[in-house]
Amino acid sequence: YGTQVDTEVLEKKVEEYRTEFKDELNMLDEGCYTLPKYTSDSPEVQAACDTMNEYLKASITYKMKENVVVDKTLISEWLSYDENMNVTFDEDKVKEWMREFGKTYDTVGSTRTITTPTGKTVNVSGGTYGWSVDEATEATALIESIKKGEVIEKEPTYVQTAATHDAQDWGSTYAEVDVTTQHMWYIVNGAVVLETDVVTGKPTPDRVTPTGVYSILELKRNKTLTGTINPATGKPIYQTPVDYWMRVTWTGVGFHDATWQSAFGGTIYQTNKGSHGCINMPLNMAASLYDQLSVGTPVIIISAMGQVKDR
């Protein structure tokens, strides 16, 4: 049962054996060892084992591109017991594991690779589109599933989702803008169905078009675009009516017609004719794109000059 000697008992037994001229002392039989508080047969130990085994019955499989399984191997790392055989399930460790799970599978703002219709392959970072695990909600759900000993397959709870779990998680239907070449494409099921030269934001900190992976947030007809307030005048720096508005960011970037532009493409955007961040399009192309887009359609904005975050 134990290897710790009870010196008080041992001394008494040695004296007793010496007095009685006994030459061999069996320390175990004579109770010279300190008995453990619990043995494998103790009810408290059995109860603790039963409790832990209930947790270890659970197996939660997250259906990702490659399944992620939370089973007894991992759950056992979250279980412990104290000197009184009270079992503890460390929920904080579950939450920490879920945070790491989110870091692994979240794609919002991450660096992804895209090959343009012209064959150019570039990295694109930033933006608002992609997978984002609801770590708090999913950690709570995982804890409950483990406590119940559930054996289930499931998708994690997401704050937002994307088209696919592939590396290019925007799928095969999306709008793409190349700031460097001042050109955009609308691609449906992998095929270009619309393309045109554009004028993007003037490359200054306050007007540059942000690069990254976004999505269409809003579609509106006959909208007046309003700039920031000029402190000197107390009025917006611009108020511009457009026929077709396709919002990409809540900070005011989007696709729209720009009938005031006499030309598109080239280096126009580098002059004062560059936009305030929006993607200016010919009227007929803006109308066609508007008719084909839907809210949620991914938008990839790239630039060979480097990544520029949304303002």
What are these regions (language model features)?
Residues Y244-I301:
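Active-site scaffold segments
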